[in-house]
Amino acid sequence: EKKSELNFDPLTEVNSFEDLRKFPLFEDEWLRGGPVRRWVPKGLENEPTYVFETGGTTGIPKSRVVMRDHWRDYEMFSHTLPDEYFPKGSNWLMLGPSGPRRLRLAVEHLAQYRGGISFCIDLDPRWVVKLIKKGWMEHLEEYKKHCIDQAVTVLTAGHDIKCMFATPKLLDQLCTALEERGTSIKEVGITGIFSGGTEFTPQWTRYCIEELFGGPTEQSGIYMTPTYGNTLMGLACSKPVTAEEKYKISYYAPQPRAVVEVVSFDDHNEVVGYGDTGRVKLTTLTDELFIPGFLERDEGEREEPFETFPWDGVSGVRPFHEIAQSTTVGVY
């Protein structure tokens, strides 16, 4: 159907990554509504299929069908985690959104892949966004407390949980709640944390390490790694965050499954220079999903490759300046 709209033949005229620029940009609005089976590749139509949603606070949410991509993404991510702080066989807490979201099942698979069991809480991010937009701050505080209480209960129930996922906001609130109860994230046994969300800034990271954890990993015994991802991309890992680099956070996509470029605000096919600012552009190339260029709602600076990830990265990720004021962050 789309092929008939193109001015080139994608079957014969796409021979390199550069050739993907011939395609028009992918529009995520196409993901609203059904039937979702139109997104299932013919070769996978008999595979068990999941559907994950993003957004949906108002109107029809965007949906992505998945067979095994969420497993593969997190298995690859698993191999970047240091076993010293994410011990094989240890249990996990998923302190993030529940419901029709990829993240919950993905973290559960990550725990199982590493030989552990994942515990989770009930958290509806759509309700959080509605509370913020309505200005119901008292209700918002009670709902946050309700979510954190669930996490504290799990962590203090003797489940031998050493690893967890949390968004920055929820991790901050969890540490505060534990402190109010006379304990800490370290004392309840957590040694490894992977986190992600738009609140992940160098300033917050420094505060978290110095104030919430009590010092760097060598001193606190707690290792935290930032991540950047979504339903369409998968998971981008970060370069190790250090005080020497002023807690700068640089993300690297899981090539070749996904490629992140920082492109000019005026020309989405023009990659900016290293250190320059631009919009984040995503290309996804798995056997389940083909996205030949999608402009994320984020901007950042282009980063140089390094030893672990020998391809371009992006730092300073934040909401795209033209829509930043209209973006409600919620639990992320």
Labelled PLM ranges:
Residues D69-D73, A111, G182:
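A glycine- and small-aliphatic-rich helix-loop capping segment at beta-alpha/alpha-beta transitions
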Residues E1-P100, T153-T156, V331:
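Nucleotide 5′-phosphate-binding alpha/beta core
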Residues S78-P82, E108, C175, I209:
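Short, well-ordered alpha-helical packing segments
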Residues E1, R101-R104, T201-Q203:
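Short, charged/polar "capping" segments at the starts of alpha-helices
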Residues G43-T58, E108-W127:
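Short, compositionally biased "basic patch" segments
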Residues P82-D124:
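Conserved AMP-binding loop of ANL adenylate-forming enzymes
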Residues I117-Y332:
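Active-site glycine/GP-rich loop and adjacent strand/helix microenvironment
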Residues D69-Y74, L103, Y143-K144, A166-T167:
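Phosphate/oxyanion-binding active-site loops and adjacent basic polyanion-contact surfaces
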